[in-house]
C-alpha cells in the first residue's frame, strides 16, 4: 500500500520506499544491536534483498508497511490485511536500540490500527510475540491486546504467544 502518511504526537508514519533501506536500516537486521525477537533478522541480509522485500510489500494492496520517522527508527507492518475477514496481522520492529523501551509502541500501533479501522474497516489486529519478550507482551496488553489460544493465524512455535485486539 503506497502513499500512506499518519501523524502521531511524536512521529510520522509513512509508506516505506526502497530508498529507505540503507546501511543503517541493514544494521537493524544484521548488526550487533538487532532485536533477537525479529524473525527476519535470523539470517544475514543484503541491501538488495531488503530493498526487494520492501518493494514487494509496498506494491501489495494487502500490506501496510510503514516506517516510523522523526528520523527512521523502525517499522510497523500489517501483513496480510484480510479485507473480507476485516483483520490484519501486525509486526513491529524498533530498529534503533536507543528507542526501544521508550513507550513508542502504543502511540504507533494505536495510530496505524485506527487508520486501518477508519480507512479500510479493519476490526481485528492479530500478532505473535516471543514468550520471552515480556516488555512487548506488557506493552501489547496495555494497548488492549488479549492473549488468545486460537487466532485467525496459525502459530506452530510453542515459544510464540498469540494476541488479538478488537478495534470496536
Across the structure, where does each feature detected by a protein language model lie?
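Short, low-complexity Ser/Thr-rich regulatory SLiMs
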Residues: 15, 80-82, 152
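Acetyl-CoA-dependent GNAT
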Residues: 43-98
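A short, well-structured alpha-helix characteristic of acyl/acetyltransferase catalytic modules
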Residues: 1-51
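Conserved acetyl-CoA-binding loop-helix of GNAT-fold acetyltransferases
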Residues: 101-115, 138-142
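Hydrophobic pocket/interface hotspot
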Residues: 24-25, 90, 125
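Conserved acetyl-CoA-binding loop of GNAT-fold acetyltransferases
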Residues: 141-151
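Long, contiguous binding/interaction regions
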Residues: 120
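C-terminal "cap" of GNAT-fold acetyltransferases
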Residues: 88, 123, 130-137, 150-168
Amino acid at each position: 500500500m503506497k502513499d500512506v502518511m499518519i501523524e502521531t504526537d511524536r512521529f510520522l508514519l509513512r509508506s516505506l520506499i526502497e530508498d529507505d533501506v540503507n546501511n543503517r536500516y541493514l544494521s537493524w537486521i544484521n548488526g550487533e544491536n538487532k532485536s533477537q525477537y525479529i524473525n527476519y533478522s535470523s539470517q544475514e541480509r543484503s541491501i538488495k534483498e531488503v530493498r526487494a522485500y520492501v518493494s514487494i510489500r509496498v506494491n501489495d494492496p494487502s500490506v501496510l508497511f510503514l516506517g516510523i520517522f522523526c528520523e527512521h527508527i523502525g517499522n510497523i507492518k500489517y501483513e496480510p490485511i484480510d479485507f473480507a475477514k476485516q483483520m490484519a496481522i501486525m509486526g513491529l520492529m524498533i530498529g534503533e536500540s536507543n528507542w526501544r523501551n521508550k513507550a513508542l509502541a502504543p502511540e504507533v500501533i494505536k495510530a496505524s490500527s485506527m487508520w486501518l479501522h477508519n480507512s479500510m474497516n479493519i476490526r481485528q489486529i492479530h500478532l505473535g510475540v516471543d514468550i520471552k519478550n515480556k516488555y512487548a507482551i506488557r506493552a501489547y496488553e496495555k494497548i488492549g491486546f488479549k492473549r488468545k489460544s486460537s487466532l485467525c493465524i496459525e502459530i506452530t512455535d510453542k515459544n510464540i504467544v498469540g494476541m488479538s485486539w478488537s478495534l470496536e
